[in-house]
Amino acid sequence: MAQRNPEPTIRVLYATDSCVITYSLMLLTGQESSEGVYAISYDWSSELDDLFGRQPRAPNTDAGDGWSSTEQSDADQLATALLQRKPSVSFCLLSGMVGGASDEPQDRVRPMFVCVFSTWTGARALAMTLSHGHPLSSNTLLQALTEEATFLLHNDLILALAITTENVTARSGRTAAAAKYDPQRGSVKAAVIGHSTGRSGLTSVYIHHENKVLTAFRRLYCNNNTTPFWFASKFGPGEREIVLATRYYLFQAIRCSRSGGTYDLQAVKDFIRTYNVPAAPNPTGLDLTHLTSFSLLSKFCCQSWYSRGPCALALPRYVDLRIQADVAEVSALEGFIAADRQGLRVSDREFITYIYLAHFESFNRKQLYDHLLAVSIADPGDIDRITSTSSLKRGTIEKFFAQVRIQLNIRDYIAHNVNPRVVCLPASIGSQYAQDKTYTPSSTTMSTGSAPLGVCDTSTPILKLLDRVESSLAGRGWIQTIVSPNKPQSVHSTPPLDQSRGDELSPGVSSQCGISRRLLHIASSPPVNGRALPLEVLFGQKGVPGPAPVYRVALPSKRQAFAVIANDRWETTTQNLARPGGSKQAYEGGFALAGFGEIDDCSLAWRDLQLTRTTSGVCRTALASSNASAQMYINRNEIFNSSLAVSNIILDVDFGIKRRVPLGMLHLAMRGFRAGIITTLSLIFSDATVQWDSYPCYFYKTSCPPQLVRALHRGEPSSFPDYVDGVEECYMESDFIDDYAAMEEYTDGPMDDYEMMMVDNECPQAACDNTPPNKEGGKTPLQRLDDTDACECTEKMGFRVTVPVPPPYLLAGPEALRGLARIIQQAVVLERTFTESMCSVLRDFSFIDTGVYSHGRSLRLPFFCKVGDSGEVYGGLYPFYVIPPKCNDVDEFVAQHSNPANFHFHAAPRHPTITHVITDLGGDYVSFFERKVARNREAIMTKRATLESLLSSANVSIKSHEAVEAFVVDVVLGEVVSHLATHFPDQSGEYQTVGVHTVVTKPDWILMQINRSGNAYRSQGFSCLRAKHLRSARGLARTFLSISADVHGRLCASISQQCFATKCGNNKMCTIFTLEVDRAK
């Protein structure tokens, strides 16, 4: 093993008043100059630590010593030591761009010449230069310069210059015998052999080609034209930084540090900011503003107390340990994130939020400040403690990651984040509340024995019927929802967005009358003045009980109808599933088929699979009907009524999958899904009087695409629309906008990339052929489930899950239901059975859509199908059995899947006693990460101006619709019309005489619809600002204006439109432009 060279070395960064490259070449060629060399910074090898690591002596004023005598004494001592040890002194210049970082350590200085000061005069001159910044004369340098070591650095460059300047070429030919040379020019080989190196070689080239030599050296030494100001600004701003950072970054980062050589200059300066070792004032009395020459800069740096002594000696170790402490904290954060990446089952968006939050919690302003205080030292003796004093990791664990771990246990999650608000009622009042706030039992009874009673028609006839009904009720005190078109700016009218797609605006009908809102209001209203029930007036006969369900029916060609049904023959729709043999026998026989030895989740999943497989059905007609009354039995969507109580928890589940899922594993996953639901309900409905092991959860799966569809998808194109598994129709009724947060949360994208034509007579659910796997003794139960036939869904898989609210509870309002769905989402992803079955195939862990729980939103019922643009019927929702572990009657449980009372939001409760009504789940059941982001934003971010404060400054009350609308008409509309005239000149004329109507008022956002003024027969729509449409689609777009405050505290107005055309997103709200409002006008 080679021994380390004990020869001591010193490296000096030098500068001159003139061109440093020219001066250096003069020295290398043996020419003496009248100028001297200034030392800007220097470094020494470890063999000289005892020499330069001693603290310089301060003058003893009591003994009459001055700075000059102290300087002489220190210089003499240093000169003696240098003369004794004779270190090799390399004089260096900058090499490469200063300040950047690199993946690998790179030398930042390059030596120009090497000296050994072997005389007392030379050693003392060097000592005065290093300790006091005196210039070193060229004569002294020439006497001490060692040519062998110096020109060993430059001989290669000298040869390269000789070859290029003499214009020589390499020989041609592969062998020596075939070698050919250009007779007019010499060869490279001859030039290398014949040209001398060393001082004579450099002098020869320099004399004949001075400019080329200067250019080559300047490029090699990075065009070194630095100035004192450059050094002060680059390495400053203080004495400590300019002395210590210059030395460490240029010299010590490569020689002493293990990892410091890869950090940039700013990082080095940041390290030194926490290196608070005190030092005496600079003896020169100068500051950085005085450093206008290299002479002053050299004196300032060399006489600084940071240039030598324990402070200078300990810096490399401090930087190493400081880097170690920083990296340990950052690595801990990465370790936590890596661990949570596998265990934290949240949506992709939430996981991204989690990563940002984790970094914010670890590296926010306070955390970093505390960490920097912990790693700051004032005594070099305290360096070793900095790796253990930081609380950055410990504080992050306690304040953030411990809270994240709570999210991984549903019981802790609910205990910390959920605080249900329960209203306790006497049994008599509770029963009356349930009777008034849920559907009449006859509307969801399988067979009432009487003819169906209800109304069902398309939008235009329904609107006319509603006008007549409300006009009839107006004399009894009914408040009409129709608004006179002569008052478009009224604040009492119904919100827009209600016109059905495919139905043109009829003359005389205000576009502000929401069909679903009016129907929901009539269907759920009590008798007017205690006499006339609005539902009776709607049906035209007495004795009609209420409330009644309101449905939306999808028709071909994107049309739709609406229905209110008081009683119906549900058996014509739900009793289409034939069950050969008894369900119980089929269920219990599943063990024998599989050969399972014990009852566990795998065996129960297998029996669920057998029961689902034995259920066959009859598909609907091949094409949808244009007759609304007939189509109602093919497609039916319940419209959510926020004024009624909720008796069934209905979940719209859409799984995004990476590949096909074996049906056995899917049944196993749904058992885990059920377990998550039951766990949530048992914790929230703590007073429920039920047996949770036998409590029903009804699952319905969207039918798989048939074989014909897969053939079309793989081969020829089809004119049929994409097959959709889960997300419901994009019908946007007026009332959805009453909950803007729910609107944002709702997704509209297609679910399956399949095209479909149901022409076979076989139920789509039966398209998944689930023959039992061959018995193989070596396979585990889980492997047997994994070997079952796969579901035909390849990208998306839709489910509808319904769970009766356990007695004696009811839910009141959409907020409680939306919160419960979000908690169930959290509980399901924490269920081990579910995650182990589905984790590898799920694209996202956000699969329960909570946007459907808004007034006026519709959700398709089980046993009904979807309707394509061309009238084809597909995607029916059919039972997917998940039998409770302790089910008392399997046949009854299977039959209950067809009971409409189990899959309507507002069906009459099956239990007679209601004593608890949950109005809100309270607490912070929203995502922990969302809550954390909101709190951090409030605590850290600058307080932004609110919309209320901006309007108040204009003497407008945000609580007064009339005042806000007047402000918009007087101030905002003028700027909007001016902008339209500039950028949309063809459509701007439509906005010359318009008014506004308030739709939604939020604390930070107000949405208004722009209405045309004029008579009732004038079209209320506007031209689309995004695209040109055919004549039939012109003038049907609705325009909205919203005002809000931006992040800079400015009042902004946005124009949005909703166009019914397909190319514009089928009724999708789209922002056209946003502008700043000049309130000074």
UniProtKB/Swiss-Prot annotation:
Its EC number is 2.7.7.-. A zinc finger (CHC2-type) spans 1024-1064. Residues 484-508 are annotated as: Disordered. One of its GO terms (cellular component) is host cell nucleus. It is an enzyme of class 2 (transferase). Keywords: DNA replication, Host nucleus, Metal-binding, Transferase, Zinc, Zinc-finger. The record marks 652, 654 as: Essential for primase activity. GO terms for molecular function: DNA-directed RNA polymerase activity; zinc ion binding. InterPro entries: HSV_PRIM. Residues 484-497 have a biased composition (Polar residues). GO terms for biological process: bidirectional double-stranded viral DNA replication; DNA replication. Its main location: host cell. It is found in: Host nucleus. Associates with the helicase and the primase-associated factor to form the helicase-primase factor. HAMAP family: HSV_PRIM (MF_04011). Essential component of the helicase/primase complex. Unwinds the DNA at the replication forks and generates single-stranded DNA for both leading and lagging strand synthesis. The primase initiates primer synthesis and thereby produces large amount of short RNA primers on the lagging strand that the polymerase elongates using dNTPs. Belongs to the herpesviridae DNA primase family. This is DNA primase.
